[in-house]
Design a protein with these regions (language model features):
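Generic recognition of stable, solvent-exposed alpha-helical segments in well-folded globular domains
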Residues: 33-36, 57, 98-106, 149, ...
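Helical lid/core segments from catalytic subdomains that handle acyl or acyl-like groups
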Residues: 40-45
Length: 194
């Protein structure tokens, strides 16, 4: 199947516009890149993780035997879990601009993370000297030590065995907080994508 060969991760986006909880339904086994991205972008908020057994029609099709696409579901309140669902009250009053915007922001983060989630490897042995590469701050501020620490922690785990999400999870930051660090390290050729 051509889809399976060409899709590395996808998201079923449904019921995304209300102001209630966020929800996530994994792929059949919950071990795909789509699952990893979904859990990472939702980890900083209160969300409900459902079992694949709580799936709906779309999940049944995308993840069925023989199809097995790596597509996870991200939504606000899961279909069937809000009182207005499939009643005459299930209308545009259920959604809101802030709910839609919040849903949009999460999906945007998921796509950005998919695009930037690579395996990185440091190009030098041992801990690199940051100062001669212009990566060490020349003025000490309240945040400069923490910034250097995150960069050094990233470098420690950029061994080619961990992707960006793995590293972010290991060092306890959001992957998006590493985007700028990755760009800086790539610019001075301290890391490479493998």
């Amino acid at each position: 199947m051509i889809w399976k060969k060409n899709i590395i991760a996808g998201f079923n986006i449904t019921t995304i516009g209300d102001d209630r909880n966020y929800s996530y339904i994994p792929t059949r086994y919950g071990n795909t890149l789509a699952d990893k991205v979904s859990k990472h972008i939702l980890q900083d908020i209160d969300y409900v993780e459902y079992s694949f057994l709580d799936r709906g029609r779309d999940e049944r099709q995308y993840c069925s035997h023989g199809v097995g696409l790596p597509i996870a579901t991200i939504c606000r309140t899961k279909y069937g879990e809000y009182p207005e669902y499939h009643t005459s009250l299930d209308d545009l009053t259920v959604i809101s601009p802030s709910g839609l915007y919040g849903g949009y922001e999460k999906i945007k983060k998921a796509i950005e993370l998919l695009e930037k989630n690579d395996y990185y490897k440091v190009t030098v042995l041992c801990e690199p000297q940051l100062g001669k590469r212009g990566l060490y701050p020349t003025i000490s501020t309240k945040t400069s030590a923490a910034t250097v620490r995150v960069m050094m922690d990233f470098i420690t785990y950029a061994d080619g065995d961990n992707d960006l999400i793995d590293i972010a999870n290991i060092i306890g930051v959001q992957a998006e907080d590493l985007f700028e660090i990755v760009d800086k390290l790539k610019a001075v050729k301290l890391i490479k994508v493998i």
